[in-house]
């Protein structure tokens, strides 16, 4: 009876010690879970590569998507960071860079290896690590060291492109034609890149013949935009805020709208609709978009002569519920020169490229989609890491919680599938999409201008990084630069253009009040440098104080338990 009592007492002490450890871990903290975190995980865009970049294709994945310079894989295996605290494996998008293309020496490719006795018509990009051009009998080919063999397959379904095969001897050089058959894809490698560039050149030629070029008089050249926003970008911001105000007014009345610096890649929302065969739409160069995961939607297939057709590619991220074939004869009805989507829509085809219209004699598989800007949202209640005490005291920046626009707008799976019964009319989203389609080229130019300003400013403030966080605050107050994004403040009335200037004035006032404080200037000015040491010092003292007590308690409990078992 005494042994049983001692054993229960020992178990109680172990349980109590475990609770103390849990409390200590909780004291140090895992960090708070951001509001809307599950939604953000659900709506992470594939090409954002939330799971990071890996060197090889993941062993366990359910879906893959071409992202231009890399391929995204939706993994679920036991890789690093894939286990979720809620139980089970957390899916995440991991990206693998595509094979490198080695540039030619002085612009002239060398001769092909002697092992290339036969020239393959296709070679998948997963079968080699890097490639370069070579010449044989006056023709240019690709050559690489074969890493593995592979059979051609319909990985994305029988209505999609055939994935190229890999033939040859592993470890030996292989050569293949840079132009693959029109219905074969090398998984986004150099062959697909050449096809995409060829389509762009064909479309440029069509546009050049369709629309006369504008010649500016030397005395009437357009003036540079400078640091101010052009009307197109302002329209995108205002339209986005209007839609956000209609769907989520609480968030819209106090928030930051953040645009990614560099080339914008809008998000595509697959929809169903009716295309028109009147050709009354403008044709422009395709632009990249960021699609969601796999979804069921109607598809459009273009059939034409392989020799004269324009291969726009085959969409990968969707399952076709139905396929409407647009043959060459159909597209020539009424002297039609292009296939037009409904207003506010685009065609999304191969390599995630969006087309405002499809030219005559196009070849491929496309879907209809609306697009929303590449904009993230920061709640106005989120503390923005302005360069005040944080940087004066040499503290690290706080992580800013960005909310994807799809989450902020409340676009659900029902919306993506074309469902009805939405709180806000789908017409509202299409209106925003139409605005973005019209201004996508100008939008790219404006954001690139802002990127140039960051680069110029970075050279000036290379030793004072705080300047990057108030970009253009002293140059007109355009936006706040946070984590490679350009953020604009908005309230219920719209975009507030003087917000950055007000923040700058408030920051100067706070710094002046801080430096005027005698405590701050104490210790001959060493106090700002001592503050960063207080946190680690306090943690060390706490560990040295509680550590021996915890270890002593655990040792005594284990010793008592062993003695109880022996007796």
UniProtKB/Swiss-Prot annotation:
Lipidated residues (S-palmitoyl cysteine): 549
Motif interval(s): CX6CC: 479-487
Annotated disulfide bonds: 255-258, 255-487, 479-486
Pfam families tied to this protein: TLV_coat (PF00429)
Side of membrane Extracellular, spans: 36-525
Signal peptide: 1-35
Keywords, sorted A to Z: Cleavage on pair of basic residues, Coiled coil, Disulfide bond, Fusion of virus membrane with host cell membrane, Fusion of virus membrane with host membrane, Glycoprotein, Host cell membrane, Host membrane, Host-virus interaction, Lipoprotein, Membrane, Palmitate, Signal, Transmembrane, Transmembrane helix, Viral attachment to host cell, Viral envelope protein, Viral penetration into host cytoplasm, Virion, Virus entry into host cell
Posttranslational modification: Specific enzymatic cleavages in vivo yield mature proteins. Envelope glycoproteins are synthesized as an inactive precursor that is N-glycosylated and processed likely by host cell furin or by a furin-like protease in the Golgi to yield the mature SU and TM proteins. The cleavage site between SU and TM requires the minimal sequence [KR]-X-[KR]-R.
InterPro entries membership: TLV/ENV_coat_polyprotein
Motif annotated as CXXC, chain positions: 255-258
Region (Immunosuppression): 462-478
Cytoplasmic side: 547-567
Sugar-bearing residue positions: 245, 274, 280, 306, 319, 328, 335, 491
Record-level GO BP terms: fusion of virus membrane with host plasma membrane; symbiont entry into host cell; virion attachment to host cell
Segments crossing the lipid bilayer: 526-546
UniProt site (Cleavage): 398-399
Keyword Hydrolase tagged: no
Region (Fusion peptide): 402-422
Function: The surface protein (SU) attaches the virus to the host cell by binding to its receptor. This interaction triggers the refolding of the transmembrane protein (TM) and is thought to activate its fusogenic potential by unmasking its fusion peptide. Fusion occurs at the host cell plasma membrane. The transmembrane protein (TM) acts as a class I viral fusion protein. Under the current model, the protein has at least 3 conformational states: pre-fusion native state, pre-hairpin intermediate state, and post-fusion hairpin state. During viral and target cell membrane fusion, the coiled coil regions (heptad repeats) assume a trimer-of-hairpins structure, positioning the fusion peptide in close proximity to the C-terminal region of the ectodomain. The formation of this structure appears to drive apposition and subsequent fusion of viral and target cell membranes.
UniProt subunit comment: The mature envelope protein (Env) consists of a trimer of SU-TM heterodimers attached by a labile interchain disulfide bond.
Protein name: Envelope glycoprotein
